[in-house]
A protein has these predicted regions:
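Generic alpha-helix initiation/capping and coil-helix boundary signal
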Residues: 7-10, 128
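Cationic, low-complexity basic patches in intrinsically disordered or flexible, solvent-exposed regions
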Residues: 4
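Glycine-rich, acidic/polar active-site loops that bind/position phosphate-bearing ligands
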Residues: 20-269
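Short, Lys/Arg-enriched N-terminal segments with co-localized hydrophobic residues
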Residues: 9-21
Length: 269
Protein backbone atom coordinates (compact mmCIF):
# COMPACT_ATOMS: atom_id res chain seq x y z
CA UNK A 1 0.00 0.00 0.00
CA UNK A 2 1.25 3.48 -0.87
CA UNK A 3 2.11 5.64 2.13
CA UNK A 4 1.24 9.33 1.78
CA UNK A 5 2.53 12.53 3.34
CA UNK A 6 0.09 15.39 2.77
CA UNK A 7 1.16 19.01 3.27
CA UNK A 8 -0.79 22.25 2.99
CA UNK A 9 -4.24 20.66 2.69
CA UNK A 10 -7.00 21.90 4.95
CA UNK A 11 -10.21 20.55 3.42
CA UNK A 12 -9.21 18.36 0.48
CA UNK A 13 -9.21 14.60 0.25
CA UNK A 14 -6.20 12.81 -1.18
CA UNK A 15 -8.26 10.63 -3.49
CA UNK A 16 -8.22 11.47 -7.17
CA UNK A 17 -4.93 13.39 -7.35
CA UNK A 18 -3.22 12.73 -10.65
CA UNK A 19 -1.01 14.72 -12.95
CA UNK A 20 -2.20 15.97 -16.31
CA UNK A 21 0.14 14.07 -18.64
CA UNK A 22 0.20 15.02 -22.30
CA UNK A 23 3.03 12.80 -23.56
CA UNK A 24 5.12 9.88 -22.35
CA UNK A 25 7.19 9.20 -25.50
CA UNK A 26 9.08 11.37 -27.97
CA UNK A 27 7.18 10.04 -30.98
CA UNK A 28 3.91 11.19 -29.40
CA UNK A 29 5.29 14.74 -29.38
CA UNK A 30 6.39 14.53 -33.02
CA UNK A 31 2.98 13.17 -34.06
CA UNK A 32 1.12 15.84 -32.08
CA UNK A 33 3.15 18.61 -33.69
CA UNK A 34 2.21 17.35 -37.15
CA UNK A 35 -1.46 16.66 -36.37
CA UNK A 36 -2.10 19.94 -34.56
CA UNK A 37 0.07 22.08 -36.86
CA UNK A 38 2.22 23.34 -33.99
CA UNK A 39 4.42 26.23 -35.17
CA UNK A 40 6.82 26.61 -32.24
CA UNK A 41 8.21 24.79 -29.22
CA UNK A 42 8.65 26.96 -26.13
CA UNK A 43 11.49 25.63 -23.97
CA UNK A 44 10.97 26.54 -20.31
CA UNK A 45 13.05 26.09 -17.19
CA UNK A 46 13.32 27.73 -13.78
CA UNK A 47 16.21 29.84 -12.50
CA UNK A 48 17.55 29.65 -8.94
CA UNK A 49 15.35 32.52 -7.56
CA UNK A 50 12.28 30.71 -8.92
CA UNK A 51 11.55 32.76 -12.05
CA UNK A 52 10.66 30.79 -15.16
CA UNK A 53 12.81 31.40 -18.24
CA UNK A 54 12.22 30.42 -21.86
CA UNK A 55 13.38 30.41 -25.44
CA UNK A 56 11.58 29.31 -28.59
CA UNK A 57 12.55 27.00 -31.43
CA UNK A 58 10.61 26.33 -34.66
CA UNK A 59 8.66 23.10 -34.44
CA UNK A 60 9.99 22.19 -37.88
CA UNK A 61 13.50 22.04 -36.39
CA UNK A 62 12.57 19.74 -33.51
CA UNK A 63 14.01 16.27 -33.98
CA UNK A 64 13.27 13.22 -31.89
CA UNK A 65 16.90 13.20 -30.76
CA UNK A 66 16.38 16.56 -29.02
CA UNK A 67 13.57 15.07 -26.95
CA UNK A 68 15.97 12.35 -25.82
CA UNK A 69 19.37 14.04 -25.65
CA UNK A 70 18.31 17.60 -24.78
CA UNK A 71 19.45 21.09 -25.74
CA UNK A 72 22.53 23.10 -24.82
CA UNK A 73 22.36 26.64 -23.39
CA UNK A 74 24.54 29.27 -21.71
CA UNK A 75 24.16 28.79 -17.96
CA UNK A 76 26.38 31.77 -17.09
CA UNK A 77 23.69 34.19 -18.30
CA UNK A 78 21.05 32.80 -15.94
CA UNK A 79 20.88 34.08 -12.36
CA UNK A 80 22.38 31.71 -9.81
CA UNK A 81 23.65 29.10 -12.25
CA UNK A 82 27.27 29.07 -13.49
CA UNK A 83 30.22 31.35 -14.29
CA UNK A 84 31.43 32.18 -17.78
CA UNK A 85 34.25 29.60 -17.76
CA UNK A 86 31.75 26.80 -17.08
CA UNK A 87 28.80 28.17 -19.02
CA UNK A 88 27.76 25.06 -20.97
CA UNK A 89 24.63 23.46 -19.54
CA UNK A 90 22.11 21.00 -20.92
CA UNK A 91 18.31 21.00 -20.80
CA UNK A 92 16.45 17.67 -20.69
CA UNK A 93 12.70 17.71 -21.51
CA UNK A 94 10.00 16.38 -19.21
CA UNK A 95 7.48 15.27 -21.83
CA UNK A 96 4.75 14.81 -19.23
CA UNK A 97 4.86 18.56 -18.51
CA UNK A 98 3.86 19.70 -22.02
CA UNK A 99 0.86 21.92 -22.75
CA UNK A 100 -0.33 24.20 -25.53
CA UNK A 101 0.25 27.88 -24.75
CA UNK A 102 -3.17 29.62 -24.64
CA UNK A 103 -1.72 33.09 -25.31
CA UNK A 104 0.67 32.83 -28.25
CA UNK A 105 -0.56 34.10 -31.62
CA UNK A 106 1.19 31.17 -33.31
CA UNK A 107 0.27 27.73 -32.02
CA UNK A 108 2.99 26.87 -29.51
CA UNK A 109 3.70 23.75 -27.49
CA UNK A 110 5.34 24.42 -24.12
CA UNK A 111 7.66 21.81 -22.62
CA UNK A 112 9.30 22.20 -19.22
CA UNK A 113 12.94 21.11 -19.04
CA UNK A 114 15.28 20.06 -16.23
CA UNK A 115 18.98 20.94 -16.18
CA UNK A 116 21.95 18.57 -16.15
CA UNK A 117 25.71 18.81 -16.46
CA UNK A 118 26.50 18.30 -20.18
CA UNK A 119 29.64 16.26 -19.48
CA UNK A 120 28.40 13.91 -16.76
CA UNK A 121 24.60 14.10 -17.25
CA UNK A 122 24.36 14.53 -13.48
CA UNK A 123 21.42 16.66 -12.27
CA UNK A 124 22.39 20.31 -11.79
CA UNK A 125 22.29 21.07 -8.06
CA UNK A 126 20.86 24.58 -8.47
CA UNK A 127 18.00 23.61 -10.77
CA UNK A 128 14.80 23.94 -8.70
CA UNK A 129 13.23 20.95 -10.48
CA UNK A 130 16.21 18.80 -9.58
CA UNK A 131 15.96 19.96 -5.97
CA UNK A 132 12.33 18.84 -5.96
CA UNK A 133 13.28 15.47 -7.47
CA UNK A 134 15.96 14.96 -4.80
CA UNK A 135 13.47 15.83 -2.06
CA UNK A 136 11.00 13.26 -3.37
CA UNK A 137 13.74 10.62 -3.60
CA UNK A 138 14.90 11.40 -0.05
CA UNK A 139 11.36 11.05 1.29
CA UNK A 140 11.08 7.60 -0.29
CA UNK A 141 14.47 6.60 1.14
CA UNK A 142 13.38 7.45 4.69
CA UNK A 143 10.41 5.13 4.58
CA UNK A 144 8.18 7.86 6.03
CA UNK A 145 6.09 7.90 2.87
CA UNK A 146 6.23 6.96 -0.80
CA UNK A 147 4.47 10.07 -2.03
CA UNK A 148 4.17 13.66 -0.81
CA UNK A 149 1.21 15.74 -1.94
CA UNK A 150 1.53 19.52 -1.89
CA UNK A 151 -1.44 21.88 -2.01
CA UNK A 152 -0.77 25.55 -2.73
CA UNK A 153 -3.33 28.15 -1.71
CA UNK A 154 -2.76 30.58 -4.56
CA UNK A 155 -3.89 34.17 -3.95
CA UNK A 156 -3.13 37.36 -5.86
CA UNK A 157 -4.19 40.99 -6.36
CA UNK A 158 -5.61 42.60 -9.48
CA UNK A 159 -4.73 46.32 -9.56
CA UNK A 160 -5.83 48.97 -12.03
CA UNK A 161 -2.61 50.93 -11.63
CA UNK A 162 0.87 50.03 -10.39
CA UNK A 163 3.65 52.62 -10.37
CA UNK A 164 7.06 52.67 -8.74
CA UNK A 165 10.44 54.31 -9.12
CA UNK A 166 13.80 54.05 -7.40
CA UNK A 167 16.28 56.81 -8.25
CA UNK A 168 19.12 58.59 -6.40
CA UNK A 169 16.85 61.32 -5.04
CA UNK A 170 13.37 59.85 -5.23
CA UNK A 171 11.73 56.56 -4.25
CA UNK A 172 8.04 55.67 -4.27
CA UNK A 173 5.41 53.10 -5.11
CA UNK A 174 1.68 53.58 -5.68
CA UNK A 175 -1.08 51.01 -6.14
CA UNK A 176 -4.71 51.60 -7.06
CA UNK A 177 -7.82 49.48 -7.41
CA UNK A 178 -11.12 50.81 -8.72
CA UNK A 179 -13.06 48.72 -6.18
CA UNK A 180 -11.00 49.77 -3.13
CA UNK A 181 -12.51 51.63 -0.19
CA UNK A 182 -10.15 54.58 -0.67
CA UNK A 183 -11.95 55.43 -3.93
CA UNK A 184 -15.39 56.05 -2.43
CA UNK A 185 -14.99 59.80 -2.96
CA UNK A 186 -13.41 59.67 -6.41
CA UNK A 187 -15.08 61.24 -9.43
CA UNK A 188 -15.59 58.58 -12.10
CA UNK A 189 -16.82 58.58 -15.69
CA UNK A 190 -20.58 58.04 -15.57
CA UNK A 191 -20.61 58.74 -11.84
CA UNK A 192 -19.27 56.91 -8.81
CA UNK A 193 -22.00 54.45 -7.79
CA UNK A 194 -20.32 53.75 -4.46
CA UNK A 195 -19.94 50.00 -4.90
CA UNK A 196 -16.58 49.80 -3.18
CA UNK A 197 -15.29 46.96 -1.02
CA UNK A 198 -14.91 48.03 2.63
CA UNK A 199 -11.72 47.41 4.63
CA UNK A 200 -11.31 43.63 4.99
CA UNK A 201 -14.80 43.22 3.53
CA UNK A 202 -13.88 41.43 0.33
CA UNK A 203 -14.61 37.84 1.34
CA UNK A 204 -17.32 36.34 -0.92
CA UNK A 205 -19.38 39.44 -1.89
CA UNK A 206 -21.44 39.14 -5.07
CA UNK A 207 -21.35 41.73 -7.83
CA UNK A 208 -21.45 44.69 -8.18
CA UNK A 209 -19.08 44.78 -5.18
CA UNK A 210 -17.16 41.86 -6.68
CA UNK A 211 -16.15 43.24 -10.06
CA UNK A 212 -13.86 40.35 -11.03
CA UNK A 213 -16.20 37.39 -11.52
CA UNK A 214 -15.84 37.32 -15.30
CA UNK A 215 -12.06 37.73 -15.11
CA UNK A 216 -11.76 34.83 -12.64
CA UNK A 217 -13.96 32.70 -14.89
CA UNK A 218 -11.66 33.42 -17.84
CA UNK A 219 -8.59 32.65 -15.72
CA UNK A 220 -10.20 29.40 -14.56
CA UNK A 221 -10.94 28.36 -18.15
CA UNK A 222 -7.33 29.02 -19.17
CA UNK A 223 -5.95 27.16 -16.15
CA UNK A 224 -8.07 24.16 -17.07
CA UNK A 225 -6.73 24.33 -20.64
CA UNK A 226 -3.14 24.01 -19.42
CA UNK A 227 -3.94 21.01 -17.24
CA UNK A 228 -4.88 22.22 -13.76
CA UNK A 229 -7.94 20.83 -12.00
CA UNK A 230 -9.92 23.78 -10.60
CA UNK A 231 -11.88 23.54 -7.35
CA UNK A 232 -13.14 27.03 -6.49
CA UNK A 233 -12.61 30.71 -7.22
CA UNK A 234 -13.68 33.77 -5.23
CA UNK A 235 -12.88 37.29 -4.10
CA UNK A 236 -10.62 37.35 -1.05
CA UNK A 237 -10.72 39.51 2.10
CA UNK A 238 -8.59 42.37 0.80
CA UNK A 239 -10.43 45.41 -0.52
CA UNK A 240 -7.95 46.25 -3.26
CA UNK A 241 -8.70 43.45 -5.72
CA UNK A 242 -7.53 40.38 -3.79
CA UNK A 243 -8.47 37.11 -5.51
CA UNK A 244 -8.14 33.38 -4.86
CA UNK A 245 -8.35 30.48 -7.30
CA UNK A 246 -7.89 27.01 -5.81
CA UNK A 247 -6.64 24.09 -7.85
CA UNK A 248 -6.03 20.48 -6.89
CA UNK A 249 -2.93 19.39 -5.00
CA UNK A 250 -0.26 17.25 -6.65
CA UNK A 251 3.04 15.50 -6.03
CA UNK A 252 5.95 17.84 -5.28
CA UNK A 253 7.44 18.13 -8.77
CA UNK A 254 4.05 18.36 -10.46
CA UNK A 255 2.80 20.88 -7.88
CA UNK A 256 5.80 23.11 -8.58
CA UNK A 257 5.14 22.91 -12.32
CA UNK A 258 1.47 23.69 -11.65
CA UNK A 259 2.43 26.82 -9.72
CA UNK A 260 4.57 28.00 -12.64
CA UNK A 261 1.61 27.41 -14.97
CA UNK A 262 -0.68 29.25 -12.55
CA UNK A 263 1.53 32.33 -12.36
CA UNK A 264 1.98 32.39 -16.14
CA UNK A 265 -1.77 32.22 -16.79
CA UNK A 266 -2.79 34.74 -14.10
CA UNK A 267 -0.25 37.34 -15.22
CA UNK A 268 -1.18 37.02 -18.90
CA UNK A 269 -4.96 36.60 -18.70
Amino acid sequence: MEKLLVLGLSFLEVTGAERFVMFTQAQEVIDFIAQEEIAYIDVRFCDLPGVQQHFTIPASELEASVLKDGLMFDGSSVRGFTQIHESDMKLIPDLSSAFVDPFRANKTLVIIFSIVDPFTDEPFSRDPRQVAAKAEAYLRSTGIADTCYIGAEAEFFVFNDVRYQVSPQHTFYALDSDEAYWNTGRSEAGGNLGYKVPVKGGYFPVSPADDFTDLRDEMANLLTEVGLTLERAHHEVGSGGQQEINYRFNTLMAAADDMMKFKYVIKNA
